[in-house]
C-alpha cells in the first residue's frame, strides 16, 4: 500500500501507485482542459504531485508542450535566475564489488584498469582542479569495503579541504558513494561534506534486481532507503537521481518525484538536487543493450516537467550530455553543470592514454572549463563558483525556505558575481575575462537592494586588488 511517510521502500515507492499514475496519465493525455488547469496550477510555483506531473509529461500536443517549456523557463528564472553553478567530479577509486550490468566498474570487468588514489595523488588531482578554477567537487568511488572503506573517504575529504594552491581552494565537497549506515553518514556530516548524492538508478524493483545481480547494491530496500538514513545521520542536503534508460522513463520519472515527495513529507525538506543522467557508452557497456534509452527531445521534456514539479530543487547534468543538449536544458531547468570533467581515476593530473582508460562513462562535452565558462557568458548565464550557503549554514530546511520564498537571490546573485570575478582574475583567458567583466557590470544593476549592491561593488574592487573569499 502506498504510504508517503513510510520508512519502507516498497511503500513510499509503491509499484501499484506508479502503475495507477501511469494509467491516469495515459487516460487523460488528450484532456486539454485538465492539462491547462495543471499548467495554471504549476505557474503558482508551488510544485505538482507525481500524478499531475506524469500527465504533463504524457502530453504531446505541440502547443501545450511549448507552454510547458515556457513555464519551466519562467520557474527556473524565478528561483535560480541566470546563475549556473559549476562543479567537477573527482574519482577516487574504481574498485567495486558490485555487479551493476550498466557500469564498467562492475566486479567481473577484467579489461578496465583498477586504480585507487593515494592521498598524495589526491593532492595532485586537487591542485590540477584548483588550477582550472574549480571550488566545488563531487567525490566518486566504487563500493569496496576493503579498498574504499569509509575511513579512506573521510581521510580524502580532509586532504581535499587542506589544499590551498596559489589562490585556489575547494570550498565544498559533495560525496557520491554507496548507500551506508546512519553512523557512517554522521561521520560524513562531521567531515564537512556539502550534499550527499546517491542515484537510485531505477525505481522498478524487478528491473533494479536484474540490473544489480550481485554485491551489496543488489539490496533494493537498503539502497532506496539510504536517503532516510542520511537524514537521520544529520545530512540535511541530499541529492537524488535516476539513470534514464535503464527502465521505462515514465516509470522512473514517477518514482523520482515520489522519492522527492517522501523526503519532504517525512523530514520537512525535499532533495537539495535532482540529477538527470542518461545511459551512455563506456568500457564494455553498449547503449544498444538498453532498449529504454531516451531521445534528446524526451530528455528535454523530462527536465522541464521536473523543474515545474519540484521548483525549489537544484538540477544537475554532467558532461555525459553534448554541448547542444546542455544548452537546451539550461533554459528548461538545469542549474548546475560540470565543466572540464575527467571521469577516470587520476585523470586531471595525468590524462590517460585510451588503452589505459579507467573512465566510468564516455564524456560528450570535452571542452575545458574556460571554454565552458566563455560559452555560458555568451548565452547570458552567470557561471557561479559560489559555495556560500553551505559555509554560512544555509542548508536543509533553512536553504529551502529561502528558495521557496524567492529570497535566495539576495545572497546568490552577488555571491555568483564575486566568485566569477575571482575566476576571471585567477584563471580565465583574456577573452573570457573581458566578456565576464562586462557581464558583471551589467548584472550588478540587477541587484535590487542598494546596501547589498554597494557591499558587492566594494568586494569586487578588493578582489581585483588580490583579496579573496567574500560572501553574503
Regions found by a protein language model. Name each.
Residues 141, 195, 200, 221-285, ...:
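Conserved C-terminal portion of the radical SAM core fold
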Residues 1-37, 41, 324-332, 341-472:
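Radical SAM enzyme core and accessory elements
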Residues 80-81, 85-121:
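Canonical Radical SAM [4Fe-4S] cluster-binding loop centered on the CxxxCxxC motif
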Residues 211-217, 288-292, 358:
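Short glycine-enriched, charge-decorated loop/helix-capping segments at active-site entrances
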Amino acid at each position: 500500500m502506498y504510504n508517503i511517510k513510510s520508512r519502507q521502500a516498497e511503500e513510499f515507492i509503491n509499484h501499484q501507485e506508479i502503475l495507477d499514475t501511469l494509467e491516469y496519465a495515459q487516460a487523460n493525455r488528450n484532456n486539454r482542459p485538465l492539462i491547462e488547469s495543471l499548467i495554471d496550477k504549476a505557474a503558482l510555483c508551488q510544485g505538482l504531485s507525481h500524478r499531475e506531473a506524469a500527465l504533463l509529461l504524457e502530453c504531446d500536443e505541440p502547443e501545450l508542450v511549448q507552454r510547458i517549456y515556457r513555464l519551466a523557463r519562467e520557474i527556473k528564472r524565478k528561483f535560480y535566475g541566470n546563475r549556473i553553478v559549476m562543479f567537477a567530479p573527482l574519482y577516487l577509486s574504481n574498485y567495486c564489488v558490485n555487479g551493476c550490468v550498466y557500469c564498467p566498474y562492475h566486479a567481473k570487468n577484467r579489461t578496465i584498469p583498477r586504480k585507487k588514489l593515494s592521498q598524495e595523488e589526491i593532492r595532485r588531482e586537487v591542485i590540477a582542479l584548483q588550477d582550472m578554477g574549480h571550488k566545488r567537487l563531487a567525490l566518486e568511488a566504487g563500493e569496496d569495503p576493503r579498498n574504499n572503506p569509509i575511513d579512506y573517504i573521510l581521510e580524502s575529504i580532509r586532504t581535499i579541504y587542506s589544499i590551498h594552491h596559489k589562490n585556489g581552494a575547494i570550498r565544498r565537497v559533495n560525496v557520491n558513494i554507496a548507500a551506508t549506515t546512519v553512523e557512517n553518514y554522521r561521520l560524513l556530516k562531521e567531515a564537512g561534506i556539502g550534499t550527499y548524492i546517491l542515484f537510485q538508478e531505477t525505481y522498478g524493483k524487478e528491473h533494479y534486481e536484474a540490473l544489480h545481480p550481485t554485491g551489496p547494491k543488489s539490496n533494493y530496500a537498503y539502497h532506496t532507503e539510504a536517503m532516510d538514513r542520511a537524514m537521520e545521520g544529520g545530512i540535511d542536503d541530499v541529492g537524488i537521481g535516476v539513470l534514464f534508460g535503464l527502465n521505462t522513463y515514465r516509470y522512473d520519472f514517477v518514482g523520482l518525484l515520489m522519492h522527492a515527495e517522501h523526503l519532504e513529507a517525512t523530514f520537512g525538506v525535499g532533495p537539495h538536487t535532482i540529477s538527470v543522467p542518461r545511459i551512455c557508452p563506456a568500457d564494455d557497456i553498449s547503449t544498444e543493450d538498453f532498449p529504454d534509452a531516451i531521445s534528446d527531445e524526451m530528455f528535454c521534456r523530462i527536465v522541464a516537467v521536473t523543474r515545474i514539479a519540484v521548483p525549489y530543487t537544484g538540477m544537475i547534468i554532467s558532461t555525459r550530455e553534448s554541448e547542444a543538449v546542455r544548452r537546451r536544458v539550461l533554459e528548461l531547468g538545469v542549474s548546475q553543470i560540470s565543466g572540464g570533467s575527467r571521469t577516470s581515476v587520476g585523470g586531471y593530473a595525468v590524462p590517460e592514454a585510451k588503452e589505459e582508460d579507467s573512465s566510468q562513462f564516455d564524456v560528450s562535452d570535452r571542452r575545458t572549463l574556460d571554454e565552458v565558462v566563455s560559452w555560458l557568458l555568451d548565452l547570458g548565464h552567470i557561471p557561479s563558483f559560489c559555495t556560500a550557503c553551505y559555509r554560512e549554514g544555509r542548508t536543509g530546511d533553512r536553504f529551502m525556505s529561502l528558495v521557496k520564498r524567492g529570497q535566495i537571490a539576495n545572497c546568490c546573485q552577488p555571491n555568483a558575481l564575486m566568485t566569477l570575478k575571482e575566476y576571471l582574475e585567477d584563471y580565465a583567458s583574456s577573452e573570457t575575462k573581458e566578456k565576464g567583466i562586462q557581464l558583471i557590470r551589467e548584472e550588478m544593476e540587477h541587484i535590487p537592494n542598494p546596501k547589498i549592491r554597494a557591499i558587492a561593488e566594494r568586494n569586487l574592487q578588493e578582489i581585483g586588488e588580490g583579496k579573496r573569499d567574500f560572501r553574503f
